[in-house]
Structure formats: structure tokens, C-alpha cells
Amino acid sequence: MFVASKQADEQKKLVIEQEVQKRQFQKIEELKADMQKGVNPFFKVLFDGGNRLFGFPETFIYSSIFILFVTIVLSVILFQAYEPVLIVAIVIVLVALGFKKDYRLYQRMERAMKFKKPFLFKGVKNKAFMSIFSMKPSKEMANDIHLNPNREDRLVSAANSYLANNYECFLDDGVILTNNYSLLGTIKLGGIDFLTTSKKDLIELHASIYSVFRNFVTPEFKFYFHTVKKKIVIDETNRDYGLIFSNDFMRAYNEKQKRESFYDISFYLTIEQDLLDTLNEPVMNKKHFADNNFEEFQRIIRAKLENFKDRIELIEELLSKYHPTRLKEYTKDGIIYSKQCEFYNFLVGMNEAPFICNRKDLYLKEKMHGGVKEVYFANKHGKILNDDLSEKYFSAIEISEYAPKSQSDLFDKINALDSEFIFMHAYSPKNSQVLKDKLAFTSRRIIISGGSKEQGMTLGCLSELVGNGDITLGSYGNSLVLFADSFEKMKQSVKECVSSLNAKGFLANAATFSMENYFFAKHCSFITLPFIFDVTSNNFADFIAMRAMSFDGKEDNNAWGNSVMTLKSEINSPFYLNFHMPTDFGSASAGHTLILGSTGSGKTVFMSMTLNAMGQFAYNFPANISKDKQKLTMVYMDKDYGAYGNIVAMGGEYVKIELGTDTGLNPFAWAACVQKTNATMEQKQTAISVVKELVKNLATKSDEKDENGNSISFSLADSNTLAAAVTNLITGDMNLDYPITQLINAFGKDHNDPNGLVARLAPFCKSTNGEFQWLFDNKATDRLDFSKTIIGVDGSSFLDNNDVSPFICFYLFARIQEAMDGRRFVLDIDEAWKYLGDPKVAYFVRDMLKTARKRNAIVRLATQSITDLLACPIADTIREQCPTKIFLRNDGGNLSDYQRLANVTEKEFEIITKGLDRKILYKQDGSPSVIASFNLRGIPKEYLKILSTDTVFVKEIDKIIQNHSIIDKYQALRQMYQQIKEY
């Protein structure tokens, strides 16, 4: 009976154990599946379960028993007084209740007291301040901030003479040896454009961060990651745009941008390697520098230095997609500066300054105080007084509880704050034996404290994941310090930060008792952190996910100089808009741009705005550019008068070609003018050839064409006769009024031939009252003047007329191509598909896209309908030759169309169709895409009306143009819009 019962119990235990193992296996598989998706659990059992005894921290239990015992001995036994015992007991109970509310209270109190009562913690506060505010030896400079309590600072003065001779053996470019005998190296990293990158790609990129910390499982390494958000001022108000309206509009825009809050977000990873773990003695002392020991000691240090550099290079390789840059020394005007020291100095009070690091002098030329004179601490805020007597306020944020799981987007809202901050994450990996001991210790404490089966299962899962090498564990702490120029701004920033963190599942508040700890902890420090707990390597990688913007354009030293203008990115950082590919000033760089946006998306406003901004390129040319080429010409091929007001306000010539009305175009007069200039022989011949081909096209208008577009019935003799007559007319010294009429008069013998040259040209001749006499048979002054800075041509009237559109477009684009002579040239073609529908225009544009770069010209093609542009004969050329693509909102777009023409990803297409409201998606070959705003709120409304002309105002603008008594057309336009009731 007893045996049967025992077997039944064992069988039951076996079933339970199998069920537990099954559940644990399922749990592990679920965790692994989540981790594959970038979702990593917090093992909160490590936060408090392993450090508590009967529900309280064991150090608190032992300390309370000791204090109570001493009180009883002193009060009751010696003095027969019971009140002190009661008071101590009440204090212990109150503290215990505090633990019930916040299990970290004891640790926070202990660490905070190091700053509040330094006499109880010898030297801690003084050392912490001294490390920042005193002069330190150059290459040991920063890590006193680090203050490990298990070490003594024994770089004694007795060794100074040896240091003076041999300290250089500890130095290397980008590596600092501290007086705590640790090596420090810092890498600056670029962000990932998380807004425009697909989730799958983000997970793959983030996996490289996971791999870094799985490769470091020894406690001799520590990592300090800083996210630094620094306010910057965008001041472009001193730029000259050359034209009155351009200057007025861009001044209003630039002043608005100057008032905006722009921030620069930077990421830094500092690696520390502890050398003491590799030496036989706990600290180095003078005998290391004795003659018989120094060479061996030097050899060990050099070996460790090489190993440290190898590890940093490994990290750079693993994080190569984040564009790592080592902070090293650099030379300017013969003086050596240290980027690395500048960064550590910056962490004090967010003051940027060059940092001299002269290798011939062991002591810094400037103090390691970051430009800070004094620091004051209050309850929830602090104030920094800088050397220049400027003030900055700060506050620390304490995170009490963490969300159940971590993901790479955990701190996205923090990065988007309208505030300056330094966010430091500290991580110290544990080795495998320490991990095993930690897990066993935690398991025992869970049993003692009556922990749940769920905690036990969680611990089992953790052990399995660690054992398989999926994750590692390490000690972690953080310090988030906000900065502001005013107290009110500081309070607002704290409110926004706390709200953002709480919305992500954290429990955060402004630090009070521990604020000093957090302030000093941001300098690569564990010892001053109020709370340190264990997290997985994946958790830490999620904390430091570099989600910002890796491509911000280029502010200056572009092909034509400065950036076109500055826009604001989604994370409030500046985006320097350029059309050219990144290059150096004066270099020939492709700048052709495709602009796509539906009706109402702001396409015309954007094009007009940037056209005004490009007025600045009429100045500042490279020295190798000849004087006659130091000029800028901008041509805008318009549709439906959208740019009419803008061209007029800029002081440009707006050519309206209307059916039946003399165009003012005289190709013969233009070609004859070229013959009289100092143009090259090739340019002169080209001008004649253009007119020959144009007149031949007129003569063969009604002919049946072959597959190459050549007339079947036009004889070679007629072609030669026509060409000779055109050449004679252009090169002869004669009046070129009505040149088509003069040609017909020259062909008098053909009047009776229905297929002769006279009959062919008669429709374009005034003397014969031809149907199209208004096209080119005009006075001897051609209307197109490309010596002007800005010219607009509207094709609304003729583009849909197949009888005349091919001839007008041919002449216009031939003239434009001729004007691309090495000067800076911008050609804008709005609703490009309408112009490119003509095969000859398509040929011209295709040639421009392929060769204009060498002639210092850029072409910008814009359209509302991507489908129509795909139907153009040069769609493939557009895709290949336009490295810059700018997208505005298009709710009705088709993914396959965008992919065919612009290589758009699914994520980018989602943004185009849903996420662009007065914003652009900028995509340039070889660079990540960027979302940037061209928000024009606050700009005078009359300026905005000028940028994009509504059709209802076309006649009013016509009146202004036709009224010759109005000299300043721009001011007339401005007054017209100001008088409208809407304003």
C-alpha cells in the first residue's frame, strides 16, 4: 500500500515536472520568436527578487538588526532608556514601508548620501567635483569621474618624475589611460532613418547592435552610451538672393527658421577596459616604474593597448552601418586638439570648446571643467553658471519602473523632445561563471521569499537563453539630464519628458533626492548611479537604438556653395536641401531632380520657393570659372500659369504664348545675333543648324513621315535649297523682320507649285495671311533673352495644339540647350509629361539629362501624374539620370508606378500616400531618404499667393504687366494680394 502510494506520488511529480518543462520550452520558444521580431522581455525577477530577504533587501534586514541591537545595548543596558529604542524601531518601520512602496529606496539613499553627507563617505563628493573642476594630467583626465569604490587613487606624487619621462608609453591616438588604470576609447555613431526604413530592415540593422554586446562577456569591459541632443541655431538671414522678392521672401523664411527650435542628435559609445584585472597587484605603485620592472610593465601595457584597439576596431566593424567615427586627436594651426577630450568636457555642462592636448606637456592647457564655473542643486532642478556668466538650468529624470518588454523604439519619444538633454546608459557585462552564480543566487532567494512558480519558470527560461548564448547579462544604469536656457522651459521639458516615458509604460518622475547622482553619472560613471540592476544584452541594445537621421544633407561646400535652404526634419534636426549629389565646391555634380506631387500637395509652392532660394547662386564662384560664365540663369517651363506671379515678382520675363497672337519669336534674328558675337564657330554653326531644322519641320508639317520622322515627299533638292536660303538670310547683313515672308519671296518661282517650298511655308507667312503666321514670322527682335536671371514660359495655350506645339517646343528647348554654356543654369519643367510628349523635345531633354552636368546645369522635372510621365519615351532615362527625387503627398498613387520610375520602397510609398502634409520625402541616390517639412506658417500670406498663382488672378497680373506706368511689378502684386478681403 505504502509502496503504491509512493510510486503514485513519484509518477505525479514526474508528470508535473514534464508539464513544467513543456511549458518552459513553450515559453522559451515564444521568447525566441519575440526576440526575432525585436521584442525583448525584461526579466524583472533580476530587479528585486534576488536581492531581497523576506520581502526586503537583505542589507536592510542585516543593518536594521545591527542598529537595533546597538541601540538596545547603549540605551537599555547602559542607560536604562527605552525611548531611543522606540524611535529607532519607528524609523526602521517607516523605512520598511518605503521599501514596500519603492524597493530601490535603500540603494538610492545609500548612493545619494555620498553627495549629501560626504563626511560619511570619505572623499567621494570631493573627488567627483575635483574630477570635473580641477586640472588633471592630460591622458588620465576623465575617469576620476568614474570613482570605483573598490579602488584607491594611488597615482602618487612620488611617481611624478617617472611619469614625466615615460607617460607617453600609455598614450595612443583615440585612447586615454585614466588614473584608475582603465583605457577609454569613444566612437561617434550615426543614426538610422527609422521613419523611412522598413521594419524588416530596421530589425536586421538592430541585430548588429545585439551582436556587439554578445561578443563582450567579461567584466573588464564597460560600455557607456550617450545620446546627446544639442540645440542649434539656423541663421541664414545674411544670404543674398539677388532679387528683391527673393530677398524679401527668403528673409521672412530664414527669420522664421532662426526662431525655430532645431536640434542636433549625436550618439557616442565609450568603451572602457579595466587593466587592473590583468595585473598581479590590486593597484600600480612606484615600484612599477623602477628600472628593473618598468620595461616589463611597459610591455604589458602596450600589449593591452593593442588588444583594446583591436576590440574597438571589432566594434566599429560590427556597427559599420552606423558610420562609426573614432574620436581622435587633430591638428589645427600647429596645435594638437583632442576630439575625445572635447566630448568628455562637453558632458559637464553641454558647452562646446576646443580642447588642447599637447603631447609635450603632461598637463592640460585648459581645465577639465567644460566651461562651467559653478553648479547649484535645488529640489528638482539645478543651475549651471558658466565661465562667461551665462546660465543653464537642468533637471534629472528618474525611471522607477520599466515596461514589460523592450524594443528599439523604446526611447523614440525622448529623442523627439523639444529639449536639450544627455542620456547616458551604462552597461557592464558579466562573465559566464558570474551569471551562473547570479541565477543560482536569485533562485534561492525566490524560494526563501516565497516567490511564485511564474518567477521560477522565468528564471529557468533566462538560464536556458544564457546557456545557449542567445543573450548575456550585465549590470545597467542610466542618467537622463535635461537642459534649458530658462526655468520655465526646464519645467515644461520635464513635464513633456515624464509624460512621454509614462506613455511607453515607464514610471518616471523628476529626480529629487538623487539629482546630484544623476548629474555626475552622465560622465561615464557607475558609482554615482542611484540604481543599478541586471538586464540582458538585448535590453541594453534596445535602450541605445540609434534611431534618428543619418543623412542631413550638406550645409556648405556643395557644388554651387551653400545648401539651397534648410528644412526641418521629423526629429527637429536641420535638413540641408541640395539638388546636387554631395561633392566639393566647384565640382561637376549631377543635380537633376524629379519632383512628384498630386494636386494640392504644394508642388508649385515648393518649386517656386526653391527657385527663389537658388537666386543666391548668382554669386560666389570658384576661381577657375571665367568671368563671362559667372552668372546664373533660371528657366521655368510653366503650365496653367502656376508660377506666373512668382516669375514676375522675381523681376523675370514671363513669356505667354497664346494661339493666334504674335509670339515675338524670331529664330532668324537670334541666329544672326549669334553670328555677330564672340561665340565659337561651333556655336555659330549650331544656331544656323537649329533654324534650318526648324524651317524644314515647318515645311514638312503636313507630309507623311517615315519611322524616323522624316518626310517621305520632301525632296533632297528642296531640302538643300531651303537650307541655303536660311543660311544666306541669317549670315547676310539684312533686316530680319518677317523672315518667313523673306524666304517665300526668295522662292518666287515656286508660287504655282502646290508641293513647292512657297506652298509649304505659306501657312507660316504673314504676307500670305497664313494660319500660323503668328508663330515665327515676326519683327527682328527675338523675345527670348537668356541673359536675364529668370525667365518663365507658359505652355498652357499651345501644349495641347499638335499643329504648333512641336515647333514651339523645338525652338524653345533648342534655345535652352544653347544657353547651357557653362554658366550656372536651372531648367524647371512643370507638368513635364506634356512637354515630353513631343519626340523632339524628349530628345532634347534626354540629351540634357545626360550631358548638362558637364555644362554646369541642372534639370528639374515635375508632374502631378506619375502615370503620364511613365508613358513618356524617355521614362527610363529620367529614372537613371535624376539622382535626386522629391515626393509630395499623393493619396491616389500606385506602388508599382513609383517603383518603376523612382525605385520607391513600400515604406516610402506608405509615407507618400499617408504621411506628407506640407512635407517632402527626399530621396537621393546613395543616401537614406528623409522626411522634411517646408511649413510656411508665419510667412506673409501675400508672399505665399505670389509663389503659386491661382487662375482667378491671371488677368489681374496681366493688367499689372501691361501697365507700363507700373515700374515695380513686385510691389504691385504684393499690394494686389494685400487688398483682397481674405487678408
Swiss-Prot record:
GO terms for cellular component: plasma membrane. Signal peptide: none annotated. CDD domains: TrwB_TraG_TraD_VirD4. It catalyses: ATP + H2O + cellular proteinSide 1 = ADP + phosphate + cellular proteinSide 2. InterPro entries: ATPase_P-typ_TM_dom_sf (IPR023298), CagE_TrbE_VirB (IPR004346), CagE_TrbE_VirB_cntrl_dom (IPR018145), P-loop_NTPase (IPR027417), P-loop_TraG (IPR043964), T4SS_component (IPR051162). SUPFAM superfamilies: Calcium ATPase, transmembrane domain M, P-loop containing nucleoside triphosphate hydrolases. This is Type IV secretion system protein CagE. It comes from Helicobacter pylori (strain J99 / ATCC 700824) (Campylobacter pylori J99). The lineage of its organism: Bacteria, Pseudomonadati, Campylobacterota, Epsilonproteobacteria, Campylobacterales.
